[in-house]
Amino acid sequence: YDAINSRFVSELLDDTLPESILKAYLIQDFKFYNNGMMARLIKLAPRQETKDMLAAQSQWFADNEATYFEHFLEAYHVSQEEYDATEPTPANKEYGAYLDSLSDKSWPELITAICCMEWLYLAWAKRTVDADVIQQVPAHKGWVDLHEGAHFRKWVGDLISLVNEYCSIDGPEAEVFRTIVHLERRFFDLPGEDGPETYPYSTLISDLT
């Protein structure tokens, strides 16, 4: 529940997310996007049809998600120098290190990880559709559109089918699922020491404005 109802997500969905926070998030998530996990997943896929499905989705990400990042980083005047100089947040580093640690793990563990990640994105994007809300900020609407719709629902459905086929609640992949939920939650919001949630990107804002 917390992973899809963070402050960041809620404010993105209702168009109250500060531009400086979104700008910092785009930098962090694009760095995260380039972690190579899809390539590892395709390599381990047990059937050719599964490899083909994953490869097609990887190309879709390149054509749509990467294009989204590039467009809005440019729209928010993020230079290549600024992008390269921005260090990952602690939560991003932790998440990336965990995904790197999965590189030599089994197919069930990897497919569970990607399924959990994508399912969470669909779940929070679906919140805005269920509420019949359309974002007016182009970057907000674009991000929701990428993660809600017939194509993305089918993608997540295919992943769930693969998890049901290859994974077990008694296997190590169960811990992978729990860990991904925890890391996704940390990626979007970190609790403040004395009260309300704060964004994990807040420490970067002074460098981005």
Features from the language model and the residues they span:
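Acidic, low-complexity proline/glycine-rich segments
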Residues: 1-9, 149-158
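Alpha-helical bundle segments that constitute or directly flank the non-heme di-iron/ferroxidase center
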Residues: 2, 16-44, 111-123, 188
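Extended amphipathic alpha-helical scaffold segments
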Residues: 3-4, 34-39, 67, 156-163
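Helix-loop segments that flank and shape redox-cofactor active sites
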Residues: 7-20, 34-55, 103
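Short, charged/polar, low-complexity loop and linker segments
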Residues: 9-14, 99-100, 163-168
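A non-catalytic, amphipathic alpha-helix used as a structural packing/dimerization or gating element
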Residues: 24-32, 56, 60, 175-186
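Active-site-proximal alpha-helical scaffolds that flank and shape metal-associated catalytic sites
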Residues: 50-155, 178, 182, 200, ...
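Long hydrophobic alpha-helical segments typical of transmembrane helices together
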Residues: 165-208
